Amino acid sequence: DPSPDTTAPVIMETSIPSDSFVKFGVGSVPLQVYVNEPATCKWSSQNKEYSVMENTMNCATNLTQINARELYTCFTNLTGIKDREENKFFFRCKDQPSKPEEDRNVNVNSYPFNLRGSQPLNIVSVAPNGTATGNTNTVPVNLKVVTDDGANEGVSICSFSSTGLPNSYVLMFETKAVEHTQRLDLTTGNYNYRFRCVDYGGNAAEANVTFSVL
């Protein structure tokens, strides 16, 4: 189309959804921003004009750098992320990087983006404690974990293992909440199970439980 481009670039999506939780103590997060045309893009922690935004993204500025979704990628690293609070960022872009400044179209409104700082995930209790008894060859035992804090008040996904080896963990039957349970049918003996829980911000917590079956 030979007619001049008078439309500012549009940010279509981001590699991390806005309002996502981030891990406690992370400080910075790498992000990809996807734009509908070649552009130069910037970000700031304040809503301000493109020309005075402090941070420049590393953007695809050539038509040949289009991705499979027909978008152009900008890479950046969002810094200054604080724990336990909302972290607001603002993005703006300017199109036609090879044209004179007066021919380029710039965003007059920012693309708002938010990351939610979190706190450490805690395992507050594990069960069973002590001894489990029954009057059959196998005794039903309920493993239980209770989690708190973290990205979303303890909501997390927990796994258990009898060895603690990296690939030995199995998702607990009831999880994705603050209480996590798993029924096992065990024979007489001494048992030690390890638990590993991870929340939606990537915070992790581990614990173990030791008990006997009589």
Which role does the model predict for each range below?
Residues 34-40, 47, 145-157, 164-166:
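Short proline/glycine-enriched turn/loop motifs at strand-loop junctions of beta-rich domains
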Residues 7-23, 123-136:
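Short, solvent-exposed loop/edge segments of extracellular or virion-exposed proteins
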Residues 97-108, 202-210:
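Beta-sandwich strand segments
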Residues 1-14, 103-125, 214:
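Proline/serine/threonine-rich low-complexity linkers at boundaries of modular beta-sandwich domains
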